[in-house]
Amino acid sequence: MVDPVACPPKAGVELADIVRQFGPKYTSQYGQGMMPSQKRALADIAACCTRELGGRLYRCDDCHDSFWRYHCCRNRACPKCHGSQTRQWLEERQAELLPCDYFHAVATVPSELHAALRSHQKLMYGLLMRVAAEAVKELCAKKKHLGALPGILAVLHTWNGQLGYHPHVHLLITGGGITADGQHWEPARGAFLVPVAVLSSKIAAKFRDALKDEAPAVFADIPAGVWRREWVSFCKHYGHGNDAVLNYLSRYVFRTAISNARILSMDQTHVTFRWKDRHAETWQTERLPGVEFLRRFLQHVLPRGFHKVRYYGLWHPSKRTESNRAWLLLILQTPAGTTEPLKLTDLLDVLGQLPQRTDQSLADLGDDEPECPRCPRCGGTRTRLLGEYSRSSGP
């Protein structure tokens, strides 16, 4: 379903331009092996912000000019469509934020497993996200590390800066958790949450065992030596409170494999884009044939129905009561530098602030009705909507 969100003005070469120019050639060469979600992504991105999706007609009361704003496709692989999604999704997440420290962890898999992950995406991506979160929960449950249940938000990424295949999971973890009796909030001990070496080996073992139990045929096709390869993970302190969470969400949740800002140019045969070399901390450029660029991009389009953002621990939907209790325990903590306990009136105020949770997910976002845009001719703000038109009925 097309969401009636008007697109912003176009600036520079965009992914949609590349899809329109090289998409037909790519489809003719590789169409038989494409997933339905990849075909849908090409079609949606090509139609995004064109008359194909319909749009709105506005009139400027300053210069009396009329102009069109076409609808976005809202495909999650489209880099142009994430602005309105980001704003609305963040509003929905406000009720789930806990006023505490946060940690950022990353779980990667050895390159020898990449072929298996690519061939069984729904199964193995889901396993990787689940076992990474389970490993964090199990380590945090030990009293020598935390002795409590944290909140975990897991995000799947499959790319590196050059659009290569690099599946890994980012985890945002609360710097503390609620104890088993539900009576206390146990904070993390400074900048330490769990030992990274133990976390890596635990994720590897849990992934191997889960795959063997749940998909024995897939497990049998993987050489035994692969499981002796080292898995790499890290976990570090990320920040405190809402700012840390919002920064994390903007950096990791609302990301596509490439943004329009990174696309530098396109000619009749090639695409040039920039990428960040994380080792040298410098920006590099790469020039690829257009079809190869689309091949790299499309390998990061996820199967239809796969949820790349998942919640575990305190943030799992089944833990609403515990999460609300954790929020209350954190709010009721005596402010730093004071010795006065909270009074009954303070408690009532806090209870009135208890957030109302929703079950809305990224896939369920509703319409985002924008305000009337500025006039592209004179820059005036006195614009008004004349009408909305369905697919292909615009000029």
What are these regions (language model features)?
Residues M1-P395:
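Beta->alpha loop/short-helix hinge microenvironment recognizer with preference
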